């Protein structure tokens, strides 16, 4: 961790995760109050979000083996940014919001594998510390994202606004 590269990767990891968790921390009220889903349907919707996570992880792992991990991470992060912007503008269309939810969760887990590969690659002599540090970056992103996603709600803006804040992080 003596060079700049691992720190840039850790920062990108934190911001990328933060962007998703700005939005995902408030997904239940977004789905019920904006998209019109019932509270009873949330279990099924969260299972769909989980399928997105699994698919994103599997796909990006294979892509990171075949292509440059930095490119895979950048494309996944770009997909998250666009999907979060679309959530902000189109969340009232229920089926589209579910599709965007799956894209965002796929992107969250798609970006993780290549970032971990990059961090270990650029942490020569400190691979174990790099691998441990990436978990810290994920968790910091989660906490900071949830906090920042709640800020527009604190001032009375609607449940679509955490997605807008998240797109800025992404």
Where are these predicted regions, by residue range?
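Extracytoplasmic gate region of multi-pass secondary transporters
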Residues: 5-47, 51
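Small-residue (Gly/Pro/Ala) motifs that create kinks and tight helix-helix packing interfaces
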Residues: 28, 60, 144-153
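Juxtamembrane helix-start elements in MFS-like secondary transporters
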Residues: 37-46, 93, 97, 127-131
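Short hydrophobic/small-residue motifs within alpha-helical transmembrane segments
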Residues: 50-51, 139-141
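Helix-to-loop junctions at the C-terminal end of transmembrane segments
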Residues: 56-69, 153-154
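C-terminal transmembrane helical hairpin of 12-TM major facilitator-type secondary transporters
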Residues: 70-115
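Paired intracellular helix-loop junctions of major facilitator superfamily
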Residues: 118-128
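A membrane-interface helix-boundary motif in multi-pass transporters
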Residues: 151-170
């Amino acid at each position: 961790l003596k060079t700049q590269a691992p720190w840039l990767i850790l920062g990108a990891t934190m911001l990328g995760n933060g962007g998703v968790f700005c939005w995902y921390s408030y997904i239940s009220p977004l789905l019920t109050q904006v998209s019109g889903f019932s509270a009873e349907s949330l279990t099924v919707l969260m299972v769909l979000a989980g399928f997105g996570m699994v698919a994103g992880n599997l796909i990006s792992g294979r892509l990171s083996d075949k292509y440059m991990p930095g490119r895979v991470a950048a494309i996944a992060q770009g997909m998250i940014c666009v999907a979060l912007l679309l959530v902000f503008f189109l969340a009232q269309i229920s089926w589209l919001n579910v599709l965007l939810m799956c894209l965002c969760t796929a992107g969250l887990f798609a970006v993780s594998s290549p970032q971990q590969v990059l961090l270990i690659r650029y942490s020569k002599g400190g691979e174990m510390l790099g691998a441990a540090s990436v978990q810290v970056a994920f968790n910091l992103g989660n906490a900071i994202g949830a906090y920042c996603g709640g800020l527009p709600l604190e001032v009375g803006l609607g449940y679509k606004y955490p997605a807008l804040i998240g797109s800025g992080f992404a």
